[in-house]
């Protein structure tokens, strides 16, 4: 989890709680099924609630592997998740714990992540347009709540069984600072996220704004179109690893390398898609697509789809994951222990 000086949001139960949901207080309320995700500090299981028979994702975090600072950040993440409620966010239901583990109950997203799908095949612009407009809706919503995601990338975008894209994994998300100084307001401090998706202002100046999320979406958009990222991995990773003195001496070179306008791949897509990609990957945050929500919603690539329809989850996706297919690595079940 990344560093942040931001305060967590307060729990807004009135806005969050589903009146039809069961109150989850113990892992004994669930039947544990197969593993769908495994990280260095957590394992995610498919579970079925014994009473309602509903299926959920249960993330199990081992307390022994983390110090108090990391556990505190996790609890702040939970508070933030409880304040968000939108059809295109992976819904958070409950958090509880026992002596050794912390458990998070969320929506079960059986369609896999976007990374899996774009690595398997090339998709046309019509499919990608729907993905992007759903993510636009999700980002507009969290930004309206003063939240920056700070790690938008295909790995953190999950598909449900109907093919809807949902923004997930808020482990480095943060509330923006509020300050009487315009230069320090609506931002967070620190190089947080995944280097190859970080915006220039995050890489160079170690700050993030809402526009930084739009840059990351632009990289994701490009990757959906071409199955590769626009900028060399080594360039960005080496920058992160460099000393502050080295960063200062090479900032201009990095800034020059992050210009998308000369990319020949962009000539192979539609004019509207090309315009959107280039606008998301604009160096100047005040000119970047997303700085103005009105310009974003009226952009030619997106304007044919009503954001009101999208924000209610009523858009019908073109691509739908195959029913019954499990988009996870089967070896996970062999490696995981509960």
Curated annotation (Swiss-Prot):
Q: Does the keyword ATP-binding apply?
A: yes
Matching Pfam families, A to Z?
Pkinase
One example of a Gene Ontology biological process annotation: intracellular signal transduction
Keywords attached to this Swiss-Prot or TrEMBL record, sorted alphabetically, are: ATP-binding, Kinase, Nucleotide-binding, Serine/threonine-protein kinase, Transferase
Could you name the active-site residues? 151 (proton acceptor)
Matching entries from InterPro entries are given as: Kinase-like_dom_sf, Prot_kinase_dom, Protein_kinase_ATP_BS, Ser/Thr_kinase_AS, Ser_Thr_kinase_AGC
Ligand binding (ATP):
36-44, 59
Assigned EC number: 2.7.11.1
Respond yes or no to whether keyword Transferase is given for this record: yes
Catalytic reaction annotation: L-seryl-[protein] + ATP = O-phospho-L-seryl-[protein] + ADP + H(+); L-threonyl-[protein] + ATP = O-phospho-L-threonyl-[protein] + ADP + H(+)
Which stretches make up the Protein kinase domain? 30-302
Q: Which residues form a coiled coil?
A: none
Q: Where is this region: Disordered?
A: 1-20
Q: What class of enzyme is it?
A: transferase
Family of this protein: Belongs to the protein kinase superfamily. Ser/Thr protein kinase family.
Designated name of the protein: Serine/threonine-protein kinase ppk33
């Amino acid at each position: 989890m990344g560093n942040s000086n931001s305060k967590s949001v307060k729990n807004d139960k009135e806005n969050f709680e589903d009146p039809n949901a069961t109150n989850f207080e113990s892992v004994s309320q669930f039947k544990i099924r197969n593993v769908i995700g495994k990280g260095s500090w957590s394992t995610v299981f498919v579970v079925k609630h014994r009473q309602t028979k509903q299926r959920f994702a249960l993330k199990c975090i081992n307390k022994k592997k983390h110090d108090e600072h990391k556990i505190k950040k996790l609890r702040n993440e939970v508070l933030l998740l409880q304040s968000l409620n939108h059809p295109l966010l992976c819904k958070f239901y409950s958090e509880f714990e026992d002596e050794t583990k912390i458990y998070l109950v969320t929506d079960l997203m059986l369609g896999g992540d976007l990374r899996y799908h774009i690595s398997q095949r090339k998709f046309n612009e019509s499919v990608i347009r729907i993905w992007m407009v759903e993510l636009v809706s999700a980002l507009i919503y969290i930004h309206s709540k003063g939240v920056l995601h700070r790690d938008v990338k295909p790995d953190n975008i999950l598909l449900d069984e109907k093919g809807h894209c949902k923004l997930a994994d808020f482990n480095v998300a943060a509330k923006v600072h509020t300050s009487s100084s315009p230069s320090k307001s609506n931002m967070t401090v620190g190089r947080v996220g995944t280097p190859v998706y970080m915006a220039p202002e995050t890489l160079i100046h170690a700050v993030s704004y809402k526009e930084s999320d739009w840059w990351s979406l632009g990289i994701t958009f490009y990757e959906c179109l071409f199955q590769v990222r626009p900028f060399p991995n080594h360039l960005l990773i080496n920058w992160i690893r460099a000393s502050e003195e080295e960063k200062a001496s090479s900032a201009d070179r990095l800034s020059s390398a992050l210009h998308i306008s000369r990319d020949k791949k962009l000539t192979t897509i539609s004019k509207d898609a090309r315009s959107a990609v280039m606008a998301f990957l604009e160096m100047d945050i005040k000119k970047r697509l997303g700085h103005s929500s009105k310009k974003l919603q009226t952009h030619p690539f997106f304007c044919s789809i009503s954001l009101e329809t999208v924000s209610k989850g009523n858009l019908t996706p073109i691509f739908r994951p195959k029913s019954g297919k499990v988009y996870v690595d089967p070896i996970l079940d062999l490696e995981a222990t509960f």
